[in-house]
């Protein structure tokens, strides 16, 4: 009976420490970082992306991360074209034949929006022509192509 009480207490403590209701992000779960799934439209398609927020040892999401998430949510329609331009430019530099968003959506697939402690945010993509490295676009505070290796 004592073991059952201990296991119940552990389960309650474990469950309460692995999720939070952030006022900006909403309900988030913790496993190495705060995360949730969310649907975003990009390149004319809807994608279910992981929203990942860095945190150390389950510490709360900070104000810089909240600020960048709020900015991205409020400005997502305006951010899509510059993101697509960055991807087009990179694809053409890699000799990929892309002419439309539909072409681009066949060779890159967004997976994760990563929010770093300093508020920088990155959109990480799977990339058909470079499976080892993939690609990322910084989407806050600036939009630019970056090397995904720095996140691994």
Q: Over which residues does each language-model region extend?
A:
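Long, charged/polar, surface-exposed segments that mediate recognition or autoinhibition
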Residues: 52-102
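Acidic, proline/glycine-rich low-complexity IDRs
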Residues: 1-40, 46, 97-152
């Amino acid at each position: 009976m004592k073991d059952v009480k201990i296991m119940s207490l552990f389960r309650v403590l474990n469950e309460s420490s692995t999720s939070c209701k952030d006022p900006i992000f909403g309900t988030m779960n913790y496993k190495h970082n705060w995360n949730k799934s969310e649907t975003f439209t990009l390149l004319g398609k809807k994608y279910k992306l992981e929203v990942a927020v860095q945190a150390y040892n389950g510490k709360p999401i900070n104000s810089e991360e909240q600020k960048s998430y709020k900015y991205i949510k409020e400005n997502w329609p305006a951010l899509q074209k510059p993101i697509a331009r960055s991807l087009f430019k990179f694809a053409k530099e890699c000799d990929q034949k892309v002419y439309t968003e539909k072409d681009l959506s066949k060779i890159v697939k967004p997976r994760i929006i990563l929010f770093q402690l300093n508020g920088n945010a990155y959109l990480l993509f799977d990339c058909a022509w470079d499976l080892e490295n993939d690609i990322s676009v910084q989407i806050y505070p600036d939009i630019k192509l970056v090397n995904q290796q720095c996140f691994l």
